[in-house]
UniProtKB/Swiss-Prot annotation:
Protein name as catalogued: Enoyl-[acyl-carrier-protein] reductase [NADH]
Organism of derivation: Shewanella oneidensis (strain ATCC 700550 / JCM 31522 / CIP 106686 / LMG 19005 / NCIMB 14063 / MR-1)
Pfam families: Eno-Rase_FAD_bd (PF07055), Eno-Rase_NADH_b (PF12242), Enoyl_reductase (PF12241)
Gene Ontology terms, MF aspect: enoyl-[acyl-carrier-protein] reductase (NADH) activity; NAD binding; trans-2-enoyl-CoA reductase (NADH) activity
Residues the record lists as binding NAD(+): 48-53, 74-75, 111-112, 139-140, 244, 273-275
Length: 400
């Protein structure tokens, strides 16, 4: 079939398998160009490995460090009549390129929050790898099915205490709007912590540790974002921030446990990037369009792949073997360039000046749109989008 982009809300409902493969190929090429990561991990589990930072982590491990990888994700395959999700095609492409280089690659399509997923991964590690020396936790899900009760809990991207009103961009109409978001209830805050906090990360690490499949020096990392006062009302000071603070709590508990044998657990605070996850957060697309333009001008721009490669090579797996630099809460900070005072001041000054008319001139909004559509495999140079493609793509994946 011939596949064209169809946007609804902040999701593109169609995906292009060839375009998604090209995205993965580009990230692999970028990793290889940067060179091998000295002291890198060799056996890596990535929970949430099909897009965004999770996918880049799997690529950094495999193509930057020749690691065997197991990827866990929840994606929909394509059929002959309908494309699958971008994450399915990303994972299929990763698997193809990893196997072509003789790298071990296994993938599990399942609900990562379930007990079954954890048991299956343990079984697979025991059978094929013995132990893993790195676990990346990179889930971004709006809903979690509690593994014991089966209850469905939903997260809320809302402020706390008062209604939040700010200038934002309507990405469908390409115009500047006033976005108003009502505050979260106590229940919504608690639910957001349940879905996006550190509880499931702890369940994963504890299950893996009890099964004896973590190496003594195993490192685990979970991803977070803090930002600055520009996005704090909706993010760090909102319901989502409470969940990310719970991630910090979990990191401390896990680090206390893993450090006994020489392992570690850290939250890595990353920069804002164009992902399916960030596009859903009110105000983030406009902020990203502003900050990206300034960071590009300063020569500091990084996408997911550059960020993660830097985290691997300059933080967790340093060539000199030294312990990574952390902040006072033991977090790895890779938002250091974005948070530079001149960059944040630029955004503070610019925010009130942005109108529908000058949006493309003052910010990287057009680039934001292009990067967003690229997540789904569209708008990539060298691909003929009028050509017939088969949306049904098979690969070596375990379905639970």
């Amino acid at each position: 079939m011939i596949i064209k982009p169809k946007i609804r809300g902040f999701i593109c409902t169609t995906t292009h398998p060839v375009g998604c493969e090209a995205n993965v190929q580009e990230q692999i090429a970028l990793t290889k160009a940067k060179g091998k990561i000295a002291n890198g991990p060799k056996k890596v589990l990535v929970v949430g490995s099909s897009s965004g930072y999770g996918l880049s982590s799997r690529i950094a491990a495999a193509f930057g460090s020749d690691a065997a990888t197991i990827g866990v994700f929840f994606e929909k395959p394509g059929t002959e009549a309908k494309p699958g999700t971008a994450g399915w095609y990303n994972s299929a492409a990763f698997d193809k390129f990893a196997k072509a280089e003789g790298l071990y690659s296994k993938s599990i399509n399942c609900d990562a929050f379930s007990h079954e997923a954890k048991q299956k991964v343990i079984e697979l590690i025991k059978q094929d790898l013995g132990q893993v020396d790195m676990v990346v936790y990179s889930l971004a899900s709006p809903v979690r099915k509690l593994p014991d009760s089966g209850e469905l809990v939903r997260s809320a991207l809302k402020p706390i205490g008062e209604t939040y009103t700010a200038t934002a961009v309507d990405t469908n109409k390409d115009c500047i709007i006033e976005a108003t978001v009502e505050p979260a209830t106590e229940q919504e805050i608690a639910d957001t912590v349940t879905v996006m906090g550190g509880q499931d990360w702890e369940l994963w690490i504890n299950a893996l540790a009890e099964a004896g499949v973590l190496s003594d020096n195993c490192k685990t990392v979970a991803y977070s974002y803090i930002g600055t006062e520009l996005t704090w009302p909706i993010y760090w000071h909102g319901a989502l921030g409470k969940a990310k603070m719970d991630l910090d709590r979990a990191a401390k508990a896990l680090n206390d446990k893993l450090s006994v044998t020489g392992g570690s657990a850290n939250v890595a605070v990353l920069k804002s990037v164009v992902t399916q996850a960030s596009s859903a957060i009110p105000v983030m697309p406009l902020y990203i369009a502003m900050v990206f333009k300034k960071m590009r001008q300063e020569g500091l721009h990084e996408g997911c792949m550059e960020q993660i490669y830097r985290m691997f090579s300059e933080r967790l797996f340093r060539a000199d073997g030294a312990k990574p630099e952390t902040d006072s809460d033991n977090r790895l900070r890779l938002d250091d360039w974005e948070l530079r005072e001149d960059i944040q001041q630029h955004c503070r000054d610019l925010w009130p000046q942005v109108t529908t008319e000058n949006l493309s001139e003052l910010t990287d909004y057009q680039e934001y749109k292009a990067e967003f559509i690229k997540l789904f495999g569209f708008g990539i140079e060298g691909i003929n989008y009028d050509a017939d493609v088969n949306p049904y793509v098979e690969f070596d994946v375990i379905e639970l």
